[in-house]
Amino acid sequence: MVLFFGPPGSGKSVQGELLVERNGWQWLSTGKLFRSSKDPEIHKRLATGELIDDKLTNKVLNEALKDINSKTMVILDGYPRNIDQARWLIEHLPNHGREIDCVIEFVVPEEELMRRLSDRGREEDVREVIERRLAIYHEKTTPVLDYLKSQGIMTQTVNAEGSIEEVHERIQGVAAACIQK
């Protein structure tokens, strides 16, 4: 399993979908799982930029993992967002015949993120919500990278600026190296 880390608008979804299309992998996005959820509490939190609580997030992810063949490479996007989720993931992946092969961190300047998110047109992509989501990402999610590194999980940083194809070439190379380690 490859974990995608990066702030909203860094291109994780686009690159995840390309890896699926070109390699036959499975892309799991907690954001996509949440947006397709019927739970009104999830939609309320999405609209305000708040994180979904760990218990509900873990449940949604656990159910999604049950539906994927353990031999299929999975790209996990948007999870874990905090150290408790990282611990839960490391503890529960073996139940699904999986482990974390590596983490790929997408890096994009904040001005570019604001432009991308404003152009994207999702309901939650208004400036106030974008700023809140970026602040939450830096405050809560970034320390997870340090925790995963402390657990011996390889982490690679990738410049996610440029054309979709340029970024994809970088991501493809790093992802391929991760799973062959």
Which residues make up each language-model segment?
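Glycine-rich phosphate-binding loop of ATP-dependent small-molecule kinases
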Residues: 1-181
